[in-house]
């Protein structure tokens, strides 16, 4: 998995930072891409990446502020104009009202999409979706308007079948390998029984990525961020601006770092950077956060991060 | 007056052309700026110009296709965020539905503007607005959906008072200059009467700028473009693609040039260039049009054109 930031600014675009959007690339066998927020100009940013809009099959919206949603109608329309193979469906997850906004925008512009568009408007906190490879959880944050954070849990990869060890045990190769890999107990032709579980290597833990919308500090953040391999957290304000952050329903870099430290996050990526922070001041934001949580980075537009598999203690595997 | 193109592409943004927007800068004493269409990313383009959003007090929308309106909510919101002196009101002229689109976008995003926003939805063709300096006319074009073209007529500048000639006539300077300039007949202290009209130089003709939305060729184009000093015309297709242009409710470069020639246009600016036209092919578009109407240019994003005063025959002045 890889994260690519398409917009890392707050409120309005600036010359150096577009408004919010981040792509989560599910590499490996799935090759789909999920977008989190679609500020105005996200489709323009995508033109400068290797992301192909047809690969984006899910969009998660944190909240309805313009700098997080105004790029949605244009992105959806342009995705429709792309030729070639049949365009797959796309599902948008977001707060109540997101389907109205998109549908009205498409209707007034008389845009007929070439693909199926589905909406899931969030109501209850907890497990939002589950498929073969992922579970996605959504919990409410504390912002000026309804706002959600997302926790993407990759499922564990099952261990590999240890073929060499099976050969040593003189188990015949063939269809029984599939049953052994599934963990079954198999009776061989010579009467011996062997247990698949004894021939499967260690499972590889899946990764956890937490992507938050704009928020004050609130207990749900701990639920969302616990043990995350990567936490994407807003940092609209700097150290010493806690009061401002609270008044404007945002967070400081130090609050984000404190959360990361408290709940065992591996890497903290700070985004939603105010236009007031430029040049050296961005380094100061990062430095202040690093004092609390060393593995912190203030991201820029187009920054890309590979998400490594977590190292776990043996007894957990 | 000056035209600055902020987006010159068709349908979707490309790396080299953004979707539609053009700014008409009313220099001289007014110093206001009028925008024609606001495709997604127009506010981003403005960041790379000297245009200050607060100076934009009128927006004219040609039609409701997404590549002409999806930048409107973001532009309006960001204009609101700008600090400093009190922000003046802004009026949007456009087809029926434009106020719904904007109001719903602002409502769902809970955006409260810091300035007064007014709408004028077009119904009848003809004179749309008149002030001290300008008349703006709107006529319907022939596109897939309701679409309008705008003709901006600058009023003539009255001639200057010929102070030297007054001195020669030994007319005393002072408050009577104002009355003479207004064309009054004034009785001097020495009993002579002098006619202001004899001491006013030639009037300067105002300029005519015609900015069209997407369109097939249709008789209203002639009404809109007659004697225009500058005609901004779409050129989605090239020579020999007349049938395609007709089917998709667009024009070819040669159709635009033919119109310009027929109705006495001074300069033709071709925009709304398809992403199919890049590099040398753009030059070909321009060359084909120039064969019919030599003073033609295919515009690029950020191209800026000063609009010169027309030279008129003496008897017209």
From Swiss-Prot, chains A, B:
Known EC number: 3.1.26.11
An MF annotation (GO) of this entry: zinc ion binding
Catalytic activity: Endonucleolytic cleavage of RNA, removing extra 3' nucleotides from tRNA precursor, generating 3' termini of tRNAs. A 3'-hydroxy group is left at the tRNA terminus and a 5'-phosphoryl group is left at the trailer molecule
Cofactor note: Binds 2 Zn(2+) ions.
InterPro entries referenced in this protein's UniProt entry, alphabetically: Metallo-B-lactamas (IPR001279), RibonucZ/Hydroxyglut_hydro (IPR036866), RNase_Z/BN (IPR013471)
Active-site feature positions: 67
Lipoprotein found in the keyword field: no
UniProt keyword list: Endonuclease, Hydrolase, Metal-binding, Nuclease, tRNA processing, Zinc
CDD domains noted in UniProt: RNaseZ_ZiPD-like_MBL-fold
Binding site for Zn(2+) 2: 67-68, 214, 272
Residues where Zn(2+) 1 binds: 63, 65, 143, 214
Subunit structure comment from the entry: Homodimer.
HAMAP family reported in the protein's UniProt record: RNase_Z_BN
Entries under PANTHER family matching the protein: ZINC PHOSPHODIESTERASE ELAC PROTEIN 1
Family membership noted in the UniProt record: Belongs to the RNase Z family.
Protein name as annotated: Ribonuclease Z
Underlying gene: rnz
């Amino acid at each position: 998995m890889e994260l690519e930031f398409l917009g890392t600014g707050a409120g309005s675009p600036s010359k150096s930072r577009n408004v919010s959007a981040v792509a989560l690339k599910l590499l490996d066998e799935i090759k789909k891409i999920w977008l989190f927020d679609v500020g105005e100009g996200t489709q323009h940013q995508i033109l400068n990446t290797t992301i192909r809009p047809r690969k984006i099959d899910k969009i998660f919206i944190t909240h309805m502020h313009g700098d997080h949603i105004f790029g949605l109608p244009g992105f959806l329309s342009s995705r429709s104009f792309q030729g070639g193979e049949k365009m797959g469906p796309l599902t948008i997850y977001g707060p109540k009202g997101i389907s109205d906004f998109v549908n009205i925008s498409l209707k007034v512009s008389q845009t007929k999409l070439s693909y199926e568009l589905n909406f899931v408007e969030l109501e209850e906190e907890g497990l939002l979706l589950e498929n073969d490879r992922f579970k996605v959880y959504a919990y409410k944050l504390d912002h000026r308007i309804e706002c959600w954070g997302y926790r993407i849990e990759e499922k564990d990869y099952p261990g590999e079948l240890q073929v060499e060890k099976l050969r040593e045990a003189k188990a015949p190769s063939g269809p029984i390998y599939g049953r052994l890999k599934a963990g079954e107990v198999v009776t061989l032709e010579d009467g011996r029984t062997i247990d698949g579980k004894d021939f499967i290597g260690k499972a590889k833990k899946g990764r956890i990525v937490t992507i938050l919308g704009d928020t004050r500090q609130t207990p749900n953040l701990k639920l969302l961020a616990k043990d995350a391999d990567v936490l994407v957290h807003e940092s609209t304000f700097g150290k010493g601006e806690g009061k401002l952050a609270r008044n404007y329903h945002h967070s400081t870099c130090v609050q984000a770092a404190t959360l990361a430290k408290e709940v065992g996050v591996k890497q903290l990526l700070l985004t939603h950077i105010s236009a007031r922070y430029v040049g050296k001041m961005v380094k100061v934001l990062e430095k202040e956060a690093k004092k609390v949580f060393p593995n912190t980075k203030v991201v820029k537009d187009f920054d890309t991060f590979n998400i490594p598999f977590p190292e776990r203690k043996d007894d957990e595997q």
